[in-house]
Amino acid sequence: MEDQMNYYRFSREQWKQFYRNNQHQVPLTAANLHEIEAFNDRISLDDVRDIYMPFAHLLQAKYEHYLSWRETESVFLHRQNRQSPFIIGVSGSVAVGKTTTARLLEILFKYLYPDRRTQLITTDGFLYPNAELKKMQLMERKGFPESYDMTRLIQFLNDVKSGKPLAKAPVYSHQTYDIVPNRFDVITHPDILIIEGINVLQLPSNQAIYISDFTDFSVYVDADADLIEDWYLERFKALMKTAFQDPTNYFYPWAIGDPKDAMAMAERVWEEVNLKNLNDYILPTRNRADLILHKVAHHVIDAVYFRKY
């Protein structure tokens, strides 16, 4: 990633110097990290110390400022200061590791604010069910902006941000590659909500209100497209030997067939779907993020970009 005019660029060594307070080191172990890693992603205790603890410290400051501003605003408007969650958006390509980043941020906030409710959802649940995608002839466009029920997603975020005591988000299954009928993640008055998905920073032309209108801080997980392709195909190969072996899995027919055919299919999906989606709709949103985590080989974060203005 080239240097951007509106971002400060910090090397890993520079970034880790911004927070050296050992009193707030989260008691995580390598085993804990393994539990939250998305499949085939990698994260280490060094990453937590060098990258995520400074990041969490920054978010802590942003959160405290947010609470202060909410109080100031309510006094000025002569209105009751209703609970409205601090929302963090996490975006990036398929297979880049944004899920792991979101899960780790959830753990860090739960540690830093044990008396506050932190919850995490993904925008996957707001994809249209496969049956509807087929009716709309959009199965080959799954993951593209038009495959999401944006009206429902925006209404959900509005309910949460408005302080409604309960909001329901549909659940997506990577096992069946579809929305799970009548199953929901229940969001109950969170103080902090992390929302993760490829479309968190997008500005759909048919929407007057965007996901980013509800977020108070956003992070984009970035890497070279060739690296992401490698990670995507590595993950697919690994899943062929594990989750895809389950007869109920959507990809089971590929797992029991010719491996060469399966890999050819995965490569086609990368080229025609994921790479196109990245180049046309995801990567152009990168410069809307407040912070960019840049990865190199082996999912190592080598640089952090922080928005100037």
Curated annotation (Swiss-Prot):
Top-level division of the source organism's lineage: Bacteria
Which reaction is recorded as catalysed by this protein?
(R)-pantothenate + ATP = (R)-4'-phosphopantothenate + ADP + H(+)
Q: Which Gene3D superfamilies match?
A: P-loop containing nucleotide triphosphate hydrolases
Which UniProt keywords are present, listed alphabetically? ATP-binding, Coenzyme A biosynthesis, Cytoplasm, Kinase, Nucleotide-binding, Transferase
**Annotated metabolic or biological route of this protein:** Cofactor biosynthesis; coenzyme A biosynthesis; CoA from (R)-pantothenate: step 1/5
List the InterPro entries: P-loop_NTPase, PanK, PRK/URK
Q: Please give the family membership noted in the entry.
A: Belongs to the prokaryotic pantothenate kinase family.
Can you name this protein?
Answer: Pantothenate kinase
Q: Write down the species.
A: Lactiplantibacillus plantarum (strain ATCC BAA-793 / NCIMB 8826 / WCFS1)
